[in-house]
């Protein structure tokens, strides 16, 4: 979606908000942002955090956000990126275990040196 919007000149006027239960750690968040997400709502993590014993739901939520942001900053610093704007849409990941045809079709601009599974596989 990010690449398509950029191609037709609409990306700067559009925000991509991903609401997902699939974020389990800061790496998942980093991948979504690197592939173009403007914001991410990891609703399943927030739901689990509110049930954390010995802290209020608000404290648990704040701790979760701090942890995700800290992890994202660590990942960005390892990649040599200092702003979220510079990281968004950067595609600074490599696909492992997927054929170049699959990667080119589903993850444009993503590197894949090893190759692997095809659609029929």
Q: What is each of the regions a protein language model found here?
A:
Residues 29, 55-121:
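Flexible, glycine-rich loop/tail regions that form catalytic "lids" or insertion modules at the edges
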Residues 1-16, 20-74, 111:
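Catalytic or ion-translocation cores adjacent to nucleophile or general acid/base/metal-coordination motifs
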